[in-house]
Amino acid sequence: KKIIFLKKYTSGQATTVSKALKFLKNDQIVIVHSCDLNFKINFREIKKKLKKYDIVVITANGKEFNYKNSNQFSWVRKNSKSKEVEISLKKNFITNKRKNRVLVGSFIFKNNEILNKSIKYIMRNKLKVKNEYYLDHAVSISKKIGFKLGEIIVKKYRSWGSHSELKNFK
């Protein structure tokens, strides 16, 4: 375990994570988790998903706060034809808004190499959203660069990332 101190602000979650990549082994599983939320997850399910997918996004059913502030979140759904995971960055999909899931900001990568390639792709191509490099974006392009994307829907998801969520947190 290692704590890395950054000397200046970064341009987003993906940029921050990229600072730690050199400390990780290429073949080890990498879990990136936002600090302003929690949920329960079954680790056996993670192992099972990583046998099938290179990257797994953690999602939850949206709450009223998410729907009212949908542009603060990325959204996930399964394509009705291909059954592949699709991500809409910082806005909900136009159709079936209440059936789409909110991307909670936690990600699992089969290994460091996959994470590194995903981040490098968005940075090399200057793919920013709201002037930041988001991991949401790095995983949304996973198919384009040859990776399989899966999803785990968690229950008991709690977030305190916004002022109103923190104020109402119990």
Short names for language-model regions:
Residues 1-78, 111:
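Conserved beta-loop-beta/alpha segment of the NTase-like Rossmann-fold superfamily
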Residues 47-48, 80-160, 164-167:
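Catalytic-core segments of class I nucleotidyltransferases/pyrophosphorylases
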Residues 170:
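Catalytic core of nucleotide-sugar-dependent glycosyltransferases
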